[in-house]
Curated annotation (Swiss-Prot):
Binds 1 FMN per subunit. Substrate binds at residues 9-12, 69, 126, 130, 134, 194-196. Homodimer. Keywords: Flavoprotein, FMN, Oxidoreductase, Pyridoxine biosynthesis. It catalyses: pyridoxamine 5'-phosphate + O2 + H2O = pyridoxal 5'-phosphate + H2O2 + NH4(+); pyridoxine 5'-phosphate + O2 = pyridoxal 5'-phosphate + H2O2. InterPro entries: Pyridox_Oxase, Pyridox_Oxase_CS, Pyridox_Oxase_N, Pyridoxamine_oxidase_dimer_C, Split_barrel_FMN-bd. Its cofactor is FMN. GO terms for molecular function: FMN binding; pyridoxamine phosphate oxidase activity. It is an enzyme of class 1 (oxidoreductase). FMN binds at residues 64-69, 79-80, 86, 108, 143-144, 188, 198. It comes from the Bacteria. This is Pyridoxine/pyridoxamine 5'-phosphate oxidase.
Amino acid sequence: MTQSLADMRREYTRDGLSEANAPSDPFSLFRQWFDDAVKTERLPVEPNAMTLATVDADGYPHCRILLLKGLDERGFTFFTNYESAKGRQLAANPRAAMTFFWPALERQVRIEGSVEKVTPEESDAYYQVRPLGSRLGAWASPQSRVIADRAELERLLADTERRFADQPPSCPEHWGGYRLLPQRIEFWQGRPSRLHDRLDYRRQDGGWSRERLAP
């Protein structure tokens, strides 16, 4: 390593987050911040990339990077193989957390809540707009299972391509979406001297409460 980890740091000076400028609805603030990220972040950065954390039946946490593919007043939607490790973990414990980090804006959003499957119709609607290779991959890959080597995966894909040579692939039953129904959404804005701004929204009595947290 060319630089000591202890010496790696930066000052956050771009912006602030005040209660006066923050809407009472966290979904409105998330949309504002997401739109800012789309305008500011540049490829190869993906503004809809997020860390998804789940917990298995033994209480061990697991996290990985996914892409947000839907947002409405109900919650935040992502898609995956239901038989994958994350799918099995969500079946055992249907709660999860998401984190979005937009470094160019010095912003982070943390979301916690319960998780439900979206309807088959919603899964199919998204599946049908995916690139053909991704649709075939959803059939070919036994996600999270041990395979012998890369050649085995390529053989599985070739078999799938032959299977659907004369017809478009349909959405597999083992693949689809989840929606995280937020109970808590925290917005973090980097500030100088590590005195960051943190606004914490929580579900309460059919609406949302909002509090400032110490950094």
